[in-house]
From Swiss-Prot:
Belongs to the reoviridae RNA-directed RNA polymerase family. InterPro entries: DNA/RNA_pol_sf (IPR043502), RdRP_5 (IPR012915), RNA-dir_pol_reovirus (IPR007097). It holds the Pfam family RdRP_5. The lineage of its organism: Viruses, Riboviria, Orthornavirae, Duplornaviricota, Resentoviricetes. One of its GO terms (molecular function) is nucleotide binding. This is RNA-directed RNA polymerase lambda-3. The keyword Cell inner membrane does not apply. Its EC number is 2.7.7.48.
């Protein structure tokens, strides 16, 4: 497809398609062209695409003609602007309405307008119609703002990337077969809709996304539904090309988006129909099954370690066909209700044709699920609060009043004689609390400091209401006047409260909480309740007891939100027959945990459980106290309680009263109100861990008590007896997965399972839980999907263009967007898009964002990142220095390890290229021979790109001037907060004096608790908004790095480059080549597939794996466990005395006996590769996390040369730690080369092992000196 408009990109297109070498000159010329391209040029380039008929479909004209907004809103009895609900109680999203009548034109861009100032002013004065218009205008604008950058940039990058035609895959030795843009339906729709809206106007973009806000085209055909629609179309257009999605499925996705735009509310329609693709593909697959293979995994004991073993494959046959009940009726009803019957019918027809579980069938599921809308859903804060915080659970079997004792302060104890199932809840929490309080570490001052510090962050925490509540009792707080920090942070709060007694701060426990919002993809927006410091403080016993339950009593894998942090093999195991899994989710979990049932029982249980171990002791700065005890009728006594119990008393008062939620809706002028709610606060440190503990405890009660009492079906009884929460029920928060292990006889009968599930639903109703149960032959856990042991990445949940913008703050200044763009690239890697197409598109996208106009002094200048910066950040080259194309894999690490890897792969080529291009010198270098690499790397901007990539991409705000007195007062207050226990301070002081004797001079700036107050101060500064000067300073620093000429890479990279390897034979595959493990990673996607089968999948929890590579698992917020770890390892490596290690551990707060024991262990213990490599800041790249990198380090990388030992490759006896670094270097090369991961042998260390080791030791000694 030759486009006249794109000719200026010609050389760049050839270089990212592997036809010519990539070079920085070509890259920067293209970046200039990208920045000169106007929005209208993008539409002209679209006009040139000769779309074929199969890309077209009827666009309903109703998407352009929408009613006025005023019939969709009203003012309620409390004088709040509210949305009228026409379609159902949850129809409170942005209505699809016309907008032109609310706009006033922009001064210079006259075709565009934004919400008229006159209307906003009338709204401020309380005019009802104007308030309604402003609410609609602002929330529609918010919906349009949920993108990373203007859509045209993403579209232009797609046009440029795809102009290179189909790509040659050197591994498969053929061209890929992805249809070109003329078959791209979403792109055609995008063009047609924009054409139709702009009509005769000279400007073609329907709306402008600018830093000042959103400007709408002044066209009568423009509606509020157009921005989310276009955002979805662009996402789909890019995915169709880069993931090789089936165009006919994408067309169905486009139809749903068009229906949503034609409906009365885009977001609402999307939310109601989001299940169409999964329901008719994933959840109804294989009703007949004729073959295929699934993995046979064994879950190793103890199960809580989450380690699995691959035992080969299991052939699938008809007996493993889907046995779960059919969803046909439900699916067709949904289709009829929303006018999508044809889409449902088409999907079901196609799903039935897949009777074999193989690469094609799972790719079909992935392609279909990728077609769901990926916008961030938006609604006003008022509606969110009134939707989410007004539900109260219906408890069918409440706890009888007579089963409680009289009050002990704020709590009552549940009597043993009660018949309520609450007694099991009480028992579990009581036991856990008693054991938690009996652990000596609970009372350790460091542990308490860690607990007190974990919520001291740069996030907000309802500070204004806290201050008001304290002023009300005449407590004045220090205001640290003139300090350049953001006051709305919990760091500032902690400093203000540091020296107040608990008797004062406890008043703030009942203070209002302010409001936070999160917008999500394919889920309702949530409101967040940021608790203040005293509220978080008294939640600690609740958190700690729940943590004890989750750690010792159930099977809860703690995991982060990124795909790579979740336990992928668990889903593989659960979904591989003969195992079966049931996805159990608790609907409205926060709202279902209230004082009426759960919290009253839990508070009493903890209060009584900790009693014997905590007598008289304060805890986390909360003193012991006395309460009235009327638990025995007619007797009133004073009962002394400990600090921990005192916390529970205050927390109970809060839970019993509920939370007072202060809503200040910035989208609706005049919507200011306080809402009382009993819903559990989403911002508490206890929320997630608490829900997990209740989830598992209630399930245990069901399996062991309630279930067996309520059925006499022998099969159901047998099933319940075989399940335990230590082995079969995995839960996190409100999400649960019941895993029914296959028996020797095969799968458990589906009818038995359904009977069991009906019982679970009935059981939940007794205490107000609505279990949302899905039993359909697939496993879904924490938003990961599996079928027959294969993960189905959900591409629609990682939108390429979308970005959550929950508040109206301005977007972050360039170059912070580059981190988001690299994030988009890595999401694509984790999701297994087509590797060559995705790398090519990512190069085009990065190029489009690599240049920025800036003011330098009085003149306009341009800041430009060289292409090498992106390589440093992890984007692999396509072809360079005369290499073959596509020899670099997307598994190339980031940073120095990645630079080492790609340079080592083509080092002889680079030397030859440099000499051929006239870069010759008489001085021979060890790495590049007679090539004048210094001059070359400066001229190609390779050095500049390398160094610019390491500079901050956010302006630095911690350099602001402040009077010394106030600054010291602030850090002293933070220090008092942290070192509230004098014993902690004396440990650190003792560590410091020991350090002076044994450690000084070995390494610089060892981590210490004394650094924390200053780090918190910096954190509170960095949370502030950057000034113009700070932005200019960042630009200036980048500019200087670009102009500077360099003579080398970093000392570490220069040392790495002395190591040479020999790549040898391919290994035996780790898994069967016929086995689909991740949809899209299949023989059509060569490099990721070959890496997966040669390295093998990761078969254990990555989080557990990395937790085992740390000496200290937890530390105070503000210190980094990795930094402590590398300091300890460096000391050991540099031959420090054991006493120096003890001193280091004392400085981070350990008690002497513990520090001494740990230091001894560190000196002697064998340390794993991943941990040892931290001494030079090497870490496992994120892109390797789904692969078995551990066995790669152990088995693929050989430190003994192929032809026997050499003097140069011998590792001196005292330098065993060098092996870890070498293993990383070798693995980096193996993973950076495309194709099968081969065995690699060490060949040469220039200058020998000892000299390399000494280089690293010198570096370790100097590191931190500059810090």
């Amino acid at each position: 497809m030759s486009s006249m408009i794109l000719t200026q990109f010609g050389p760049f297109i050839e270089s990212i398609s592997g036809i010519t070498d990539q070079s920085n000159d070509v890259f920067e010329d293209a970046a200039k062209a990208f920045s000169m391209f106007t929005r209208s040029d993008v539409y002209k380039a679209l006009d040139e695409i000769p779309f074929s008929d199969d890309a077209m479909l009827p666009i309903p004209p109703t998407i352009y003609t929408k009613p006025s907004h005023d019939s969709y809103y009203y003012i309620d009895a409390l004088n709040r602007v509210r949305r009228k609900t026409y379609q159902g109680p949850d129809d409170v999203y942005v209505p699809n309405c016309s907008i032109v009548e609310l706009l006033e034109p922009h001064e210079t861009l006259t075709s565009y307008g934004r919400l008229s100032e006159a209307i906003e002013n009338r709204a401020k004065d309380g005019d009802s119609q104007a308030r309604i218009a402003t609410t609609y205008g602002r929330i529609a604008e918010s919906q349009a703002r949920q993108i990373k950058a203007p859509l045209e940039k993403f579209v232009l990058a797609l046009l440029v990337a795809e102009a290179g035609g189909s790509l040659y895959d050197p591994v498969l030795q053929k061209y890929d077969e992805i249809p070109d843009l003329s078959h791209n339906c979403p792109l055609w729709c995008f063009r047609e809709i924009c054409r139709h809206i702009s009509g005769p106007l000279p400007d073609r973009a329907p709306y402008l996304y600018l830093s000042a806000g959103v400007f709408w085209l002044m066209s009568p055909r423009m509606t509020s539904a157009i921005p989310p629609l276009l955002s979805d179309l662009v996402n789909l257009a890019i995915l169709q090309q880069t993931a090789g999605l089936d165009p006919s499925l994408v067309k169905l996705g486009v139809q749903i988006c068009l229906h949503a735009a034609a409906s009365s509310s885009y977001s609402w329609f999307i939310l109601k129909t989001k299940s169409i693709f999964p329901q008719n593909t994933l959840h109804s697959m294989y009703e007949s099954l004729e073959g295929g293979y699934c993995p046979n995994l064994e879950w190793l004991e103890p199960r809580s370690d989450y380690k699995f073993m691959y035992m080969g494959v299991m052939p699938l046959s008809a007996k493993y066909a889907r046995s779960a009940p059919s969803n046909d009726k439900k699916a067709r009803e949904l289709g009829e209700k929303y006018g999508l019957s044809s889409v449902v019918g088409e999907l079901r027809k196609r799903t039935k044709t897949y009777v074999k579980h193989d690469f094609a069938s799972v790719r079909y599921i992935r392609d279909a699920m990728a077609c769901t809308s990926g916008i961030f859903l938006v609604r006003t804060p008022t509606e969110t609060v009134l939707q989410e915080y007004t539900q109260s659970p219906e408890i069918k079997v409440p706890i009888p009043q007579k089963d409680w004792t009289g009050p002990i302060g704020e709590i009552r104890i549940l009597k043993d004689t009660t018949s309520s199932i609450a007694r099991y809840l009480y028992r579990t929490w009581y036991l856990a609390a008693a054991r938690m309080a009996a652990q000596p570490r609970t009372w350790d001052p460091l542990f308490q400091a860690i607990m007190r510090s974990q919520y001291v962050t740069a996030r907000g925490g309802s500070g204004a209401a806290l201050r008001e509540s304290l002023y009300a009792i005449n407590v004045s707080l220090p205001d640290f006047k003139g300090l350049p920090v953001k006051a709305a942070t919990k760091i500032f709060q902690a400093a203000q409260l540091a020296n107040l007694p608990f008797s004062h701060t406890s008043v703030a426990i009942l203070a209002d909480t302010s409001m936070g919002l999160r917008n999500q993809v394919q889920r309702r927006p949530r409101s967040i309740m940021p608790l203040n410091v005293p509220q978080q403080q008294v939640s600690a016993p609740h958190t700690l007891t729940a943590d004890y339950i989750n750690y010792h009593m159930n099977l809860s894998p703690t995991s982060g939100s990124a795909v790579i942090e979740k336990v992928i093999p668990l889903g593989v195991y659960a979904s591989s027959p003969p195992n079966q899994s049931i996805n159990i989710d608790i609907s409205a979990c926060d709202a279902s945990i209230t004082w009426d049932f759960f919290l009253s029982v839990i508070m009493a249980a903890i209060h009584e459980g900790v009693a014997s171990s905590s007598i008289g002791k304060p805890f986390m700065g909360v003193p012991a106290s006395i309460v009235n005890d009327e638990s025995v009728v007619g007797v009133r006594a004073a009962r002394p309680i400990s600090g921990m119990q005192n916390m529970i008393q205050h927390l109970s008062k809060l839970y019993k009263r509920g939370f007072s939620y202060r809503v200040n809706d910035s989208f609706s002028p005049g919507n200011d109100f306080t809402h009382m709610t009993t819903t559990f606060p989403s911002g508490s440190t206890a929320t997630s861990t608490e829900h997990t503990a209740n989830n598992s405890t209630m399930m245990e009660t069901f399996l062991t008590v309630w279930g067996p009492e309520h059925t006499d079906d022998p099969d159901v009884l047998r099933l319940m007896k075989s399940l335990t929460i230590q082995r079969n029920y995995v839960c996190q928060g409100d999400d649960g997965l019941m895993i029914i292990d296959g028996t020797t006889a095969g799968k458990v009968n589906s009818e038995t399972i359904q009977n069991d599930l009906e019982l679970i639903s009935k059981y939940g109703e007794e205490f107000g839980w609505k279990y949302d149960i899905a039993y359909d032959g697939t496993a879904e856990y924490l938003k990961l999907y599996f079928i027959f042991g294969c993960r189905i990445p959900n591409l629609s949940r990682h939108p390429i263009v979308g970005k959550e913008r929950a508040n109206s703050s301005a977007e972050e200044p360039w170059p912070a967007i580059l981190d988001q763009i690299m994030g988009v690239f890595f999401n694509g890697v984790h999701d297994g898009l087509q590797w060559q197409r995705w790398i090519r598109y990512s190069w085009a996208l990065c190029c489009a964002f690599s240049r920025q106009r800036t003011m330098i002094g009085e003149s306009v200048g341009y800041l430009q990142y060289p292409m090498w910066s992106f390589v440093y950040w992890g984007l692999p080259l396509v072809k360079a220095f005369g290499s073959d194309p596509w020899i670099f894999s997307w598994y190339m690490p980031t940073g120095d390890l990645g630079m080492y890897s790609w340079i080592s792969l083509i080092r002889p080529l680079m030397t030859r290229w440099m000499v051929a291009n006239g870069y010759v010198t008489d001085r021979c270098s060890t790495v590049f021979g007679n090539a004048d690499y210094r001059r070359c790397f400066n001229e190609l901007k390779l050095y500049q790109g390398y160094y610019m990539a390491q500079l901050p991409r956010n302006p630095k705000k911690s350099g602001r001037a402040a009077s010394r007195e106030v600054r010291e007062q602030f850090t002293q207050a933070l220090s008092d907060y942290l070192m509230q226990n004098p014993e902690l301070k004396s440990r650190v002081l003792r560590g410091r004096s020991e350090w002076e004797k044994y450690g000084a001079g070995i390494i610089h700036n060892p981590p210490s608790l004394f650094d924390v107050p200053h780090k918190w101060y910096q954190g509170a500064q960095e949370a502030a908004i950057a000034t113009r000067e700070e932005l200019a300073e960042m630009d200036e620093t980048l500019m200087r790095a670009r102009r500077h000429s360099y003579s080398s890479f970093s000392k570490l990279l220069e040392a790495y480059l002395l190591v040479k390897w020999r790549m040898c034979e391919a290994r035996e595959p780790s898994v069967d080549l016929r086995l689909p493990l991740c949809a899209g990673i299949d023989p059509l996607n060569s490099d990721p597939f070959l890496k997966m089968v040669s390295v093998g999948p990761m078969l254990q929890s990555t989080r557990k794996y990395f937790a085992q590579t740390l000496f200290m698992a937890k530390t105070v917020s503000g210190l980094d466990v990795n930094a402590i770890d590398s300091a300890l390892l460096r000391l050991r490596t540099l031959g420090a005395d054991k006493k120096a290690l003890t001193a280091q551990l004392l400085m981070v707060g350990l008690q002497e006996s513990e520090a001494d024991a740990l230091a001894g262990k560190i000196m002697l213990q064998d340390v794993n590769t991943v941990q040892l490599a931290r001494v030079v800041n090497l870490a496992v790249p994120d892109t390797w996390m789904s692969l078995d990198f551990d066995s790669m380090f152990k088995h693929h990388v050989k430190l003994l040369p192929k032809d026997g030992r050499h003097l140069n490759t011998d590792i001196p006896p005292r330098m065993g730690w060098l092996r870890a670094i070498l293993r990383f270097l070798g693995a980096g090369m193996v993973m950076t080369a495309t194709g099968v991961a081969v065995d690699i042998y060490l060949e040469d260390i220039h200058g020998g092992g000892r000299s390399l080791g000494q280089r690293f030791m010198t570096w370790m000694r100097q590191e931190g000196r500059s810090a």
